[in-house]
Structures are given as C-alpha cells and as structure tokens.
C-alpha cells in the first residue's frame, strides 16, 4: 500500500493493482457490473452518458501550458482553485473504498511513450483501460513510474456547477503542470481513452513529434499508409486489408523512428455489426472484449441492430484479437497518406494527388459532409469541418499540427491523396454513392504505386491534380463534371462548396501560418 501513498486517498480498504483479465472478469461479476453474453464477452451499461461530454472538458489555465493551449470552445479554461476543489471531491469519493489501479503505456515507441496510472472504483473501467492502452510486461510493471495519473470518480458529481460557472455536474479536467486528470459524473469509458489522446496531442508536438487521429497499416514490403477521415468516411473499412497488417485503428504518433500506435486495443462501433461485412470486428468480440450499451436477447446473444440505448454502441478489445495486426504496433515512415472525405455534395473527385501545401490545407480543413434528414423529408448535405480530422482532441493551435505534417511530408517524401468516398453524379438525393469497388481501386492504385504513373489533369477551382485514367475505375467518374447531367447545377454546387472551404479556413487566419496555408485552397 505504501507505494500508493502519493495518490492522496484515505482509508483505502483494498487496492487491486494490475489485475489479470480473469481476475477483472471475476470482480465484474461479483460486483454485478454487467452481464456475460453467450460467448463469454462481458457487457456493461454506461448509464445516461453513452458518448463523450465535450462541453464538460476543461484544462487548468496556468503557466507555462496556458501560452501553448488554443483556448476556446474545444479547450475551455478552468481555474487552479476549482480544479483543486473537484480533485478533492473526487478523491473523497474514491477514499474508504476498494479501488482498482491499472498501469499502462500510451505509445508503442519507447522514446515517445507515456506511462499512465488509472485509478477507479469500477472493475470494468480497469478492464477498459487494460484493453485500450498498451499492456506493460511484468518487468516494466515492477519499475513503473507514472508520468500522468487519471482519477476516474464517475460516481462523483459537482452539485455546485452553476455557481462554479461550469456547464453541468459532469467534469473532465486536465492539469498539465501537475500531470493529473480527474473525471466525475460520467461512466463513459471513452473519456479515459480520448482524454489521454488529448494529452498526447499536447505533449508530442512540443517534442517536435506529430500526433494524429488516423488509422495505419503496413504492407509486406514495409510500406506504411495512414488513413485520416471523420466518422462515416470509411476509415475502418478501407484500412482493413487482408494484404496489409493493421498498426492501429485510431490514434498514432510519428517520431524520427516512424509511425507508432498510441493504443494496445480497438474501440469499435457495433451498431448493425454484420459478420459478413466486418468479419474482423465480429471475430474480435470474445472473452476479454468489453461491450458497451448493447442489448442482449433472452438467450444472451447480442442484438447488434438494437439502438434503443444509443446509436453509439461500442466494443473495446485488445488488438491481439485482430489476426492481421502488426505485433510491434509500429513501423517506419509513411509512404502514403490518404485523407478520406464522404462528400455528399458530389463535387470532390474520387481521388486527387495533393502537393505538400495542399496536404496542410486539407488536413486543417478536415472536411466531410453528412446527410441530415429534416422533418419534412427534405435532405440537404451538411458540411462538417474538423481541424486535423480530430478537432475535439487538439489542445494546441491546429496550425502547429499542420506545420509538423508538412515538415514530415517533405523530409520523408510522402505521397498525399484526397479520396472522396461520398457521392458522384450529383449531390445526395440526385447522385449516387461512390461504389466501394471504385474506392478500393483508387486505394489499391495508391498503395501499389501505379497511380504515380498516371497522367494527371487539373480539377478547376479546387486546383487538384486528378488522374485521366485509372485501372478499375470508369474514366468518366474521375472528373466530377463528367458525372453530372445538369452542368449548371454542378457549377453552382462546386462554387458553393469551394466557398464553404474558404469561409471555414478564415478561423485559422488569426496566425501568420494560417494566412500562408489559405493560399492553397479553392480559388473563388
């Protein structure tokens, strides 16, 4: 117990330190924390919070970190006094209890990883941490020194939130100087995952290393590909390839040795999960996996189509559950970077080659378009821009990440492409969704290098280089203007989308670099 004195908890009944999967499973059952499914996967309910609470996330405003953090709606400030008050409250909640302490690494690169200690009173949350982060060896555990501590007091709420000037009784707070995070009021496991991701996005760029919200895989010849894309763009599907090993599906770093996964597991959506279309994920759901907010049938089988608790049903599992993964969780420098956008306006080409400067522009834009249904059944695509394809998790000014990306693209001579997995031949409602076959053909041409031998032409207004012909893709598809029957509607929609890009980018022009990068977007 003595080695846990620095946690600041009183009268702890018992500490369960780095339990095995079997031990955690036994505790989950004894504590009545959930149910076992027909194939012995444990299943929990995260309560009223079935997703992250971005409006309840804060950073303590103090020097020196305050001069690096980009304060605003994403990174909200909180005072040191209020942090101390809520940390004390969280520690009181965890005191006098049996607690679980789970130690893990974030980052598969020895030079870049961080050692994180998680403290919770819930066995399944320790299980989630064990699944999602990198599991230290026995020797590493014996010499473990935490760089950062997360207190997860999910049962603790802040009743005084109104007088404290906060958004709700939930709080997720990061103190960079003290290397502590405290979570209260939400049971959602993803807060721990994305919380440490946010911290990696603070630490690494200040060490001149890039942190990225992307998936990564590696080919038989050691060629690495990164896939960036917002939800619904096909990132998981397209980075899963029988001929390539998965490095990771969500969070990566890029240091002077190459690309490395931050995590030791995957956190996959399970709504409408189908063994035929997503056999890898389906096959990964077995003992040691942890299901969240799914509905069980009477025979304890999972009804993946049931969204009665939430659309955001999830499963976490150790990456070893994916057969075709890269065991070291790292590889060399990328050969190709692919930005995925599901453009529901039907304007972006199926594939475009980007210059280094354009890559920085489209990385900062982080564009996709969602289809939003309205009450009267009229559907109008909604443009979504998320800086660096992961804005909610980026504490620094987005241009910091873009500059690092540009430097690495240049240094390691990386090819960058923009791939549209969205609509063609018209906007949503008129055009049709790009076939997965055509998209796969574009991805394959990028990965096998054949696209570099193509003849390219200019795609007007957006000033993108697009191939004139590509094996496996109808030539008419390659330039969107050829797929629209109504050319006036095409021109109008193209100009409208270009204008959205330009308007969105104005928010980066508060710094010199942003003004510089803005020159590489659409010309209107």
Curated annotation (Swiss-Prot):
> What catalytic reaction does the record list?
oxaloacetate + ATP = phosphoenolpyruvate + ADP + CO2
Q: According to its record, what are the GO cellular component terms? A: cytosol
- Pathway field: Carbohydrate biosynthesis; gluconeogenesis
Q: Which residues bind Mn(2+)?
A: 194, 213, 250
| Cofactor binding mode and count | Binds 1 Mn(2+) ion per subunit.
Per the record, the GO terms for biological process are: gluconeogenesis
What broad class describes the main subcellular location of this protein? Answer: cytoplasm
Note whether ATP-binding occurs among the keywords. yes
Taxonomically, the superkingdom here is Bacteria
As one GO molecular function, the record gives:
ATP binding
**Which co-factors does it depend on?**
Mn(2+)
Tell me its EC number(s), please: 4.1.1.49
The family database entries (SUPFAM superfamilies) matched by this protein are listed as: PEP carboxykinase N-terminal domain (SSF68923), PEP carboxykinase-like (SSF53795)
One of the Pfam families matching this protein, by short name: PEPCK_ATP
Keywords for this entry? ATP-binding, Cytoplasm, Decarboxylase, Gluconeogenesis, Lyase, Manganese, Metal-binding, Nucleotide-binding
State the family named in the UniProt similarity comment for this chain.
Answer: Belongs to the phosphoenolpyruvate carboxykinase (ATP) family.
* NCBIfam families for this protein: pckA (TIGR00224), PRK09344.1-1 (NF006819), PRK09344.1-2 (NF006820), PRK09344.1-3 (NF006821)
Question: What does it do?
Answer: Involved in the gluconeogenesis. Catalyzes the conversion of oxaloacetate (OAA) to phosphoenolpyruvate (PEP) through direct phosphoryl transfer between the nucleoside triphosphate and OAA.
Q: Under which name does UniProt file this protein?
A: Phosphoenolpyruvate carboxykinase (ATP)
Task: Please name the gene that encodes this protein.
Answer: pckA
